[in-house]
C-alpha cells in the first residue's frame, strides 16, 4: 500500500477570504491539491477525515460547489450533510450565532454558501470548528484555489503570470482574483467599464498584497491594453444571482467586453488559456439562453461558443479542480 503524505497543516483554521492566508499557505494548499488529484487518479485512498461529520449550508443554489464538497468529504472518509435554504434559518427564525453554536456541537466542519460575508464570519466566530466559505457576495476563496491550481497546471508556475479578468469588476470573482492573484505574485488586470469598477476598498487590499508579495493590479476599460501579452483570460456571467432584473442594463454595458476570437487575437499569443467559474452563457441551450436570445437577440453573452469549446478553454479542468482544492482545504484544516 502506498503511504500517503501527511496533510498540509492548517489545523483548526477557517477559510473565509483570501487575505486570511499568506502566500506560502495558499501555495501550500494548491500543491497539496495537486497531490490529492494524483491520489484520486491512481486510486490511492486518503481518508484524512475518517469519522468526521461535515455540514454543507447552502442559501444559494449550486452545482459545482455542492458536488465538490460532497465528493471531497466522501473521498476523505467524512460524512457530508446538506442543509439547504429551507433547512437553515440564518438570521430569520434563528440568529447566526445560535445556529453556529448548535452546528458546532454536532459537526466537525461547516461549509457556507450564501449572500452575507458577515454570516460566514459569524459562523466561524461562534461554532468553534473550521468554517469554509463556498461563496458570498464579497469573496469566493475556494474558487480561487481551483483557478490558480489550473493556471499552475498549464504553465508550471504562478509568479509573473499575466491574468486578465474581463467583465463586471464589482463581483466576488473580480474581488477574489485581485487579492489572491496579487498575493501569489500574479499581474492581475481587471478590464471593465468605468461604471463597474471594483470598489476602492477591494482594490486597496489587492494593492497591499501586491506590494507585499510582488504581484500587480491594473483596473482599466481599455480591452487592448488589458489583454496584451496575457497568459489567461477569465470572465464570469454578466448578471449575478439576485440581479436578474438588470440583464438589459448589463448587456448594454458589457456587450463590447465579450470574450471572443477577436479579443483573443489581441493577446498576441497562442498559449493564452480561457477560464470561467461557470455556469456560462455561451449558447442558447438553456432556458436563460433562449430567453436572452428572444429578448435581446444575443445567442452568446460573456463568451462565444467558439472560445468556450476551443483548445484555449480549461473550464472543465477548472471545475474538476474545485473538488481537489476543496479537499485540500478540508484535510489541511481538519485532518490528522
From Swiss-Prot:
The Gene Ontology biological process terms listed for this entry are: arginine biosynthetic process via ornithine; arginine catabolic process to ornithine; citrulline biosynthetic process; L-arginine biosynthetic process
This protein's record includes keyword Heme: no
- Chain positions recorded as L-ornithine binding sites: 172, 236, 240-241
- Which Pfam family, just one, is annotated for this protein? OTCace_N
Where is this chain's protein located in or outside the cell?
A: Cytoplasm
Span-the-membrane segments of this chain are: none
In alphabetical order, the GO MF annotations are: amino acid binding; ornithine carbamoyltransferase activity
Cysteine-cysteine disulfides: none
Specify the pathway. Amino-acid degradation; L-arginine degradation via ADI pathway; carbamoyl phosphate from L-arginine: step 2/2
Keywords in UniProt for this one? Arginine metabolism, Cytoplasm, Transferase
| The reaction(s) this protein catalyses | carbamoyl phosphate + L-ornithine = L-citrulline + phosphate + H(+)
Q: Name one GO cellular component term.
A: cytoplasm
Free-text function comment from the UniProt entry:
Reversibly catalyzes the transfer of the carbamoyl group from carbamoyl phosphate (CP) to the N(epsilon) atom of ornithine (ORN) to produce L-citrulline.
**UniProt similarity note:** Belongs to the aspartate/ornithine carbamoyltransferase superfamily. OTCase family.
Any idea what this protein is called?
Ornithine carbamoyltransferase, catabolic
Amino acid at each position: 500500500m502506498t503511504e500517503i503524505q501527511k496533510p498540509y497543516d492548517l489545523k483548526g483554521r477557517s477559510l473565509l477570504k483570501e487575505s486570511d492566508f499568506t502566500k506560502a499557505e495558499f501555495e501550500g494548499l494548491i500543491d497539496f491539491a495537486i497531490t490529492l488529484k494524483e491520489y484520486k487518479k491512481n486510486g490511492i485512498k486518503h481518508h484524512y477525515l475518517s469519522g468526521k461529520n461535515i455540514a454543507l449550508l447552502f442559501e444559494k443554489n449550486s452545482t459545482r460547489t455542492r458536488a465538490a464538497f460532497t465528493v471531497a468529504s466522501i473521498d476523505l472518509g467524512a460524512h457530508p450533510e446538506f442543509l439547504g435554504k429551507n433547512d437553515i434559518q440564518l438570521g430569520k427564525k434563528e440568529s447566526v450565532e445560535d445556529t453556529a453554536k448548535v452546528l458546532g456541537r454536532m459537526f466537525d466542519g461547516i461549509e457556507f454558501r450564501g449572500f452575507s460575508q458577515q454570516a460566514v464570519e459569524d459562523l466561524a466566530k461562534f461554532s468553534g470548528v473550521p468554517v469554509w466559505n463556498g461563496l458570498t457576495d464579497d469573496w469566493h476563496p475556494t474558487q480561487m484555489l481551483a483557478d490558480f491550481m489550473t493556471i499552475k497546471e498549464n504553465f508550471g508556475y504562478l509568479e509573473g503570470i499575466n491574468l486578465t479578468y474581463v467583465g463586471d469588476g464589482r463581483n466576488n470573482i473580480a474581488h477574489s482574483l485581485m487579492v489572491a492573484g496579487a498575493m501569489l505574485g500574479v499581474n492581475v488586470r481587471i478590464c471593465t467599464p468605468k461604471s463597474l469598477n471594483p470598489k476602492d476598498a477591494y482594490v486597496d487590499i489587492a494593492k497591499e498584497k501586491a506590494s507585499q508579495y510582488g504581484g500587480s493590479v491594473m483596473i482599466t476599460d481599455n480591452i487592448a491594453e488589458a489583454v496584451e501579452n496575457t497568459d489567461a483570460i477569465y470572465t464570469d456571467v454578466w448578471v449575478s444571482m439576485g440581479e436578474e432584473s438588470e440583464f438589459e442594463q448589463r448587456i448594454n454595458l458589457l456587450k463590447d467586453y465579450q470574450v471572443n476570437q477577436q479579443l483573443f487575437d489581441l493577446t498576441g499569443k497562442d498559449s493564452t488559456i480561457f477560464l470561467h467559474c461557470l455556469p456560462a452563457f455561451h449558447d442558447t441551450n438553456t432556458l436563460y439562453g433562449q430567453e436572452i436570445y428572444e429578448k435581446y437577440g444575443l445567442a452568446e453573452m460573456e463568451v462565444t461558443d467558439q472560445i468556450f469549446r476551443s483548445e484555449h478553454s480549461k473550464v472543465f479542468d477548472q471545475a474538476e479542480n474545485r473538488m481537489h482544492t476543496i479537499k485540500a482545504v478540508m484535510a489541511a484544516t481538519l485532518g490528522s
